[in-house]
Amino acid sequence: MYGTWFTTGKVTDLLARTGLDRVPVWVPVVLGVVLMAFVGSVRIDPALQGWVSIGTVTLLLVLNRRRGRGITVFLMMLSLLVSLRYIVWRLTATVQFSNWLQTALAVLLLLAEAYALMTLCLSYFQMAWPLRRREHPLPEDMAQWPSVDVFVPSYNEELSLVRSTVLGALDLDWPADRLNVYILDDGRRKAFHDFAVEAGAGYIIRAENNHAKAGNLNHALAVTDSPFAVIFDCDHVPTRGFLRRTIGWMMADPNLALLQTPHHFYAPDPFQRNLAGGMHVPPEGNMFYGLVQDGNDFWDATFFCGSCAIIRREAVMGIGGFATETVTEDAHTALKMQRRGWGTAYLREPLAAGLATERLILHIGQRVRWARGMIQIMRLDNPMLGAGLRWEQRLCYLSAMSHFLFAIPRLTFLVSPLAFLFLGQNIIAASPLAISVYALPHIFHSVITLSRIEGRWRYSFWSEIYETSLALFLVRITIVTLLQPHKGKFNVTDKGGLLARGYFDWDAVYPNVILAGVLCAALLRGVFGIVWQFHDRLALQSFILNTLWVVISLIIVLASIAVGRETRQTRNAPRVSVRLPVVVTDAHGRQMEGHTHDISLGGLAVGTRLATPDMVGGEVTVRYDSARDGIHVGVPARVLDARDGTLRLRWAVRDLEDERQVVSMVFGRNDAWAGWADFAPDRPLRSLAMVFRSIGGLLRRRPAEAPRALHEMGEGELPATEEKLEKQSFVLKPVPRSARHGATASAALFVAFTALVPAAMAQEAPSPDQSGVTAETPFGDSNTGVVPDALPAIDPAVADRISDAEVTRTLTFRNLGATTGPLTLRGYSPLQGLDVVVPANRVVTHAQLTLSGALSPSLLPEANAVTVTLNEQYVGTLKVDPQHPQFGPVSFDIDPLYFTGDNKLNFHFAGEYRRDCNDLFNEILWARISDMSRITLTTVRITPERKLSRLPAPFFDPNQRSTLRVPVVLPATGDRGALRAAGLVASWFGRIADFRKLSFPVSTTIPASGNAVEVGVNLPVDAEGGRPAGPMLAEVANPNDRWGTVLVVTGRTAQEVEVAARALVFSPDTLGGVASKVVSDVSLETRHPYDAPAFVPTDRPVRFGELVGAADLQGGGFAPAGMTLPFHLPPDLYTWRGRPFLMNMWVRAPGGPVVDLETSRVDVSLNNNYLQSYTLSPPGLWRKWSERLVNQHAGAVGHVTALPPWLLFGQNQLQFNFDARPIDRGACRRTPGDIHMSVDSDSTLDFRRGYHFAEMPNLSYFAEAAFPFSRMADLSETTVVLPDHPDTGTTGAFLDLMGFFGASTWYPAAGVTVMGADEVAQTPPKGDIVVLGTAAQLGGAASGLLARSPYVIHDRHITVGQRMGLQGIWYLFQDHDHAGLKDGVTANLNAPIAEAGVLLAAQSPYDSQRSVVAFTGDTPERIHDLVLSLRNKGDLPSLQGDLVLKNGDRFTSYRTAPVYTVGSLPLWLRLDWFLGHHPSALYLAGLAGAGLAALGVWAWLRGWSRRRIARDDLTGEL
């Protein structure tokens, strides 16, 4: 696109040899920017971010020691990368919207930070490559040189200020017949006219002063005709070579409309003069003129600054003259010309010098005008809009305009800590560590990089002081101008004033003084909070952080206040330090050669060895000649002091020619301001020290208050009334210099005149306290002062089936589920109940309920009671006895006919405490039923009915809540087919049992009593010992117990046994009411990953009605019992940056005058973690009517709830708790109690934004949802490795595990592969692997299967094995777990496993995307116990990491193995995860991105610079 990247250097040679120099520059830029953006958006743990930050800061410090623009561009890219990571962190991790106030404050701070980041980017863009344009030579033929009009506009400035500018303009080194100097006097003062006549300058006035300075210039353009116009403000005196060094570019480039030069100020600005050490700091304007404008020139976006510039008449007239719509006519004029396609240029050489604003208040006024003007341009002629500008120019103008919006962001940064210290609002929700590793590197990189770029033009931290001095004044201007851009007028900045005495300017600093007082109060509040108040760790950290923030803000504000300490200014003509060779001739003709120390329009100091005290009072002639500059000076002066080899002289100007010569000597020299940038390179620490030194200036003794003398007139003296000219348009043409006198002739006359100077008159030097300033002396500076410091019923037809043996059992309410304490009934919640379960193979013959508890003694006995019912049948009533509020034990017999399988025991409370009316929410309306109350049931067994159609009865009773046991009989041969079939049946029972505890004790013989399942080849299928005729299922009596039943799963071969098992589990509804049946095989559909029926689909929204019945989502009363929504998820759902999943919930509550919907609410919790509360208030009228037309949820109140991924597990439960309040219906008004509230079954859960991806090994995923084995519902990608001859304990553990799998997936394990340990070596297992057995049983297979585990089991001990390769380095990057895992100590693990169970997870040695989970231990019983722990909810939190040891009831978890991953992510998300877990890779990727971007940008900038300046000799270093 732009040709080759490089032309010189080592990089160029390398790229040329590899052919990469022909790659377009946009390629590395795009690649680098994309990589930087990706790296910038990756979130990592703060501790890891700390290492990344250390790396970037170290690199910055190393590279910053090397010079070169390529390094600078790279450091800019690196800085932007660090800042991008910071702002992304701020936006995604630190913002909490708890209330409207915190929201407003947090958003305001974020906007301020966004502004700061935008400003940083724009600054880098502007200053990336200053052009460093040099002067263009003029044609040798002077006849080709153009005519030039020089305009010096004035309004109310004093003549003494304007004289020097006009005389300097008249003395420009340019052909006299082509130089026209005009005074544009909007003040119409006769004195100015007379001076113009005397000096030979032109003089222009107009009839009406419209549009201020812009109008004045437009009028002058209308009455003059030169092709070029040069503009000087009335205090800007040019050097003689101004035109010779600038016009060349205007002639060489006919498309150039403007060439701007710097505004240099030879007098110190308020910051330099008023701050201690301020003179050692670059002037406030230096950065703009020394760096920004030069950068703008690179982009062809130089701003016109109103003075010291050459304008092409054709260009400015083509836009209708100078812009008059805003108060910054200069910048707006340049914008208009550039919209028309004109070019601009900037020559970074100070060719004129003027006066800076003397006082802070004047400086503020000037900046207020600039701010108003730039904001006006933004509103009225926004450069980001409209045609005519390239994008680079738009960005440059955006930078200039947006700069003056700094006031609100600056103030926001200063006062933000007050939000916490005074209002208690935490607007940055982050730990100090996180802030340190994100914010501090951002600030550090910005400061150091800007310091490198700005160098000697602007010192670090001083921009903050400059902005703070103006901020509070600019806030109002910023807002008003944004809203009303046409308001505001042009104000002339006063210059050249004097101060008789120093004083503190309250008018300029009082806003900051008030702000400092507020910050001091905040500091005291912070210290008080840290020292004397008691806080938790987080609160203490917040106090410390915000207090430090206040200290930083206070330092900046105090430094800005120090600027208001105005120092004495008694010189009308500031001194300029310069060393010039001069010759001083006294009255006796004695010539003394010397060098000046300083000069001014008032005098000079000359160092000469011949100075003697007797010269004081005498007159001398000072001669200075510079053939190079064409300056010849010979002006008389009076000796004021002569000592220590220094003569202090005051000019004794006799006429206009003398005055011109003095101006020429002081201002006309071509190198007069060459030292404008002679400041030491910026060093941030030194600069910070200067800030503290400046603050120390406030501690100096305050000077006496004094009237403010703004100019040289005496106190009480009124300005003289100036004679004005008539209001009319008038043009006085300038007199050519040749018609006045030539420069050579002037020099000759001067020499002759000096030869006639008489002897000096005897005169005493004035006393030191005399200023030497008089109204008559336009150069009135004596130059001698010292610079100042700055649960059915029995059917009779089946009664003969009942056994004679009765069993009695007593259950407390705790056993029935009241685990949280007594049942509490209240006026607004009068109903509580429990489930009483009677086993399906038993019938109740006698039942008794025994209750204890208490009733409120404040209730009326005749109107209060607790009614007890069982399945809506009356059982009894508890009466109130105010004298004895406690009751019990009270017993009630219950009719056995009331009982069914699942029974509802309910308690209904009716309470009143007064006879007229009652408040249901009164705290005295209560009753409590003790959780130690009990029910005693006597039951007998029913003769079993053996029919296959009743399966899974009698083996499984769905009403049972206690642990279920299903004995299994297996042959002792360890047949693999029988094992697979038994496992399939066990998983079917597990799927039916779901959350209930279930175990499968294994034996090789029929148990002595009870029921059992027998699986094997060629088993008897009837009492006569008949054999199967094929795959067969049969229910036969237990030969040892007539009440027991044995389910036989058999066939003639092992394959037929498996067919019988599949028929049992997949088509039990087709078996019919028979005791035995030969079955056929079942055809099964191919399963797909994550299609387990237990799992909520993640590819579509899921209705609540798909998970539970609608009745489960509704309740009665004002505070119904909590509603629950259980659901299962695959635990490997991964979202980008932990983005929450969404729940669209719709709730319904009775309308009308029943429930106070405004104060009623529904609380939503996830896995007992509170999420959010929502009002039951309906939507607005318009939304309500629109929903009736298009919404299926009409009448419901909708809410969207975020479900955080870190609160979601394999097994989950949403809880909804309604808390409604009745409407206040007045006294003695009945409040309806039979109300219903519900969660709409059409509410949805949406997990579509999740990807299946997980970090392994992770035993918590296995314990929660059998992951990763449950990924395939039929376990078709799972292999179970058992000992070759497993005992009953190991086989029982296997079946229990299959039951666990079935419960986890709700699908039988039809695809599982079972193999022996000895088969592993010949046939490596596929897929995910489960290993069951002791180390002795498994033999060498165990070590092979666990080859990638860091653990070794040997000699009844488990130890950490030898690490290999770079694994030790990997450990450095492991995360720190806070859930009780013993990270970092496992290297010394050497634990005995005697009488212990071991659960271990590792990566498969056969497939890096597969896992191995091993159940092992000292004995098979320990392994069985460990498997049973998977069904115990209380044990699940202890099962995590990659190793679990179970000793008795105690679990110990460890994590040692390196992390591996399973699943897949899109490429961009995989990279995000990878970089987020590998800080070194993140660091290197960031550097690569910054390097690529910097390489491309550097090459592009370099090429652009070559095109901007075609000749190498006309630009600086590229």
UniProtKB/Swiss-Prot annotation:
Query: Where is the segment annotated Disordered?
Result: 765-785
Gene Ontology CC terms: plasma membrane
Q: How does it sit in the membrane?
A: Multi-pass membrane protein
Q: Where is this region: Catalytic?
A: 1-731
Q: Where is the composition biased (Polar residues)?
A: 768-785
| Catalytic-site annotation from UniProt | D186, D330
Q: Which UniProt keywords are listed? A: Cell inner membrane, Cell membrane, Cellulose biosynthesis, Glycosyltransferase, Membrane, Transferase, Transmembrane, Transmembrane helix
Chain spans, region Cyclic di-GMP binding domain = 732-1518
Region spans: Catalytic subdomain B:
314-374
Q: Where is this site: Important for substrate binding?
A: D233, D235
As one GO molecular function, the record gives: cyclic-di-GMP binding
For region Catalytic subdomain A, the annotated ranges are: 144-237
Is GTP-binding among this UniProt entry's keywords? no
- What residue stretches are annotated with the PilZ domain? 569-668
Q: Reaction catalysed by this chain?
A: [(1->4)-beta-D-glucosyl](n) + UDP-alpha-D-glucose = [(1->4)-beta-D-glucosyl](n+1) + UDP + H(+)
| Listed EC numbers | 2.4.1.12
For this entry, the protein name equals Putative cellulose synthase 3
Naturally occurring in which organism (per UniProt): Komagataeibacter xylinus
